[in-house]
């Protein structure tokens, strides 16, 4: 006496959902509205403002507890920069993945030239010169966000990276670069 039950559709094929937008759960989701960070975004915009007139931006450090929106704030800022300026080239570098001076400049090169530098036989000096010369020749200002900059602290790699970025104009007159460091507060 087992009356035949209606067969449920396979759960994986259901079109119904409780969520209006599943994309908000994706790790790379960037919200349309970024609430409660207006003061921090305004401070970052103030630092970037000189670059809009072709000057050097003011360097900044975003410091706060993990998961409070530091990286998202930078992505929102960079989104706005790319929408309103061709003079500024914003580059986000994840220092957990790119933790050497060469790796940081590799990412800059890739962003500027829209392809990676040759995979072998090219020195840091050559990559550095190409990036700095492009900044000078094309009248571009590079804004480099070093996310999780604390990963550059071992071996004092941070000294080499910052020195190369902030003193590029000495090697290549006219090169303009600014740095935004992003770091979680140390417990």
List where the protein language model places each region.
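Intrinsic disorder
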Residues: 34-38, 56, 68, 95, ...
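Walker A/P-loop nucleotide-binding motif
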Residues: 55-76, 97
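Walker A/P-loop NTP-binding motif
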Residues: 77-82
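Dynamic helix-loop-helix/coil hinge segments at AAA+ ATPase domain boundaries and subdomain interfaces
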Residues: 24-42
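Mid-core helix/loop region of P-loop NTP-binding domains shared across ATPases and GTPases
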Residues: 2-19, 26, 57, 74, ...
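Conserved catalytic segments around the Walker B and adjacent sensor/switch elements
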Residues: 59-61, 83-97
